[in-house]
From Swiss-Prot:
Xref: NCBIfam families: PRK05715.1-2, PRK05715.1-3, PRK05715.1-5
Transmembrane segments: 4-24, 30-50, 61-81
Subunit field text: NDH-1 is composed of 14 different subunits. Subunits NuoA, H, J, K, L, M, N constitute the membrane sector of the complex.
GO biological process, one term: ATP synthesis coupled electron transport
Keyword Transport: yes
Similarity remark: Belongs to the complex I subunit 4L family.
Secretion signal span: none
Name of encoding gene: nuoK
EC number: 7.1.1.-
Bilayer topology: Multi-pass membrane protein
Its job: NDH-1 shuttles electrons from NADH, via FMN and iron-sulfur (Fe-S) centers, to quinones in the respiratory chain. The immediate electron acceptor for the enzyme in this species is believed to be ubiquinone. Couples the redox reaction to proton translocation (for every two electrons transferred, four hydrogen ions are translocated across the cytoplasmic membrane), and thus conserves the redox energy in a proton gradient.
Keyword Cell membrane (UniProt): yes
Organism listed in the record: Paraburkholderia xenovorans (strain LB400)
Entry protein name: NADH-quinone oxidoreductase subunit K
């Protein structure tokens, strides 16, 4: 049977993979956004695990709010990336430091 520790270890592994993904790939914005989404998934896993094992529904409800914010963040981030790609023909992070406003 799976215990709370199994889910917490899974969440920690997912969180660590996302941190490694951010630090190893600092050039591609899409991979950075995917790593941030994986980080939010790890947090959601911990919320659901604590909610289930403590018998409280608040953690599961909070997951829906986090998923909503993550979806909005992904949509806005991808819209910004499309705009940057159309104007600069690249999504390389090193080339995005010359923004004009």
């Amino acid at each position: 049977m799976l215990t709370l520790a199994h889910y917490l270890v899974l969440g920690a592994i997912l969180f660590a993979i996302s941190i490694v993904g951010i630090f190893l790939n600092r050039r591609n914005v899409i991979i950075i956004l995917m790593a941030i989404e994986l980080m939010l998934l790890a947090v959601n896993t911990n919320f659901v695990a604590f909610s289930h094992y403590l018998g409280d529904v608040h953690g599961q409800i909070f997951v829906f709010f986090v998923l909503t914010v993550a979806a909005a963040e992904a949509a806005i981030g991808l819209a910004i990336l499309v705009t940057l790609f159309r104007s600069l023909d690249t999504i390389n992070v090193e080339d995005l430091d010359q923004l004009k406003g």
